Amino acid sequence: MDSENKDQKDICNKFGASFVESPSYLKIGISRNVSEGAWPINGLRHPMEGDTTGWYIWAGEELSDDPDFFVPLHVEHLKAWRPEIIKYLGLAPGWRFLVGEDNYEDVGRI
């Protein structure tokens, strides 16, 4: 098992969530400000569909209603954007996370 899957399974076990893999070749929807170092980082997983994992990830306090707010990004490229959130991508659809500076972490079902 690679270390990313192990970390993801550890997060799922910690919070009592089922593990649902987010393969590196599938896409997430992500806001551009995530790559700019903005905090906090929010993630919300919908059911997987087509070539997507179901994940929508954004940074900041507010979710924009701009139709171009989310851009598609392959999971494998998240390593270059914000590798510290990869460990949450094994959470099942219906789960969300919020992480902030200084290791703040809030994970739960929606």
Positions of predicted regions on the chain:
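Charge-biased low-complexity segments
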Residues: 63-69, 100
